[in-house]
Amino acid sequence: MRELDVVGVRVEMPSNQPIVLLREVDGERYLPIWIGAVEATAIAFAQQGVTPERPMTHDLFKDVLEAVGAKLEQVRITEMRDSTYYAELVFAGGIRVSSRPSDSIALALRTGTRIFAAEPLLDEVGIVIAEGSEGDEEDEVEKFREFLDHVSPEDFAS
């Protein structure tokens, strides 16, 4: 398993499809995942520290975990089958629950949980975005935009 950071959420044009981009912490590969609009909003809110007036589903789930004393230890993006990504939530005691990556990422951002991807998955669909100058956040966003201009979901079909 390789640890990932969330780079951000953007909308791919012209399809108007949200995408979340993750980056290896100690590597150069990126993992793009097409997601739904609601999940994109949940991820963006968590990244920006936005607290809605009423809890969203992922906020509620975080509150339930805290109320029952459950500890989310890891989020793992495990595989892609038939152009669909799969993930699991790993709780204390080794309990694993299947989850969509978008929901897992939204929950991880709210709970401060680390996100991982399986090495074979990154080998299969991870991409390297050409480096320009030393990357700061603006460079990272620009590379992401350039990537979106040249990619489609079909590029990741097995």
Model regions: which residues?
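Divalent-cation
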Residues: 1-158
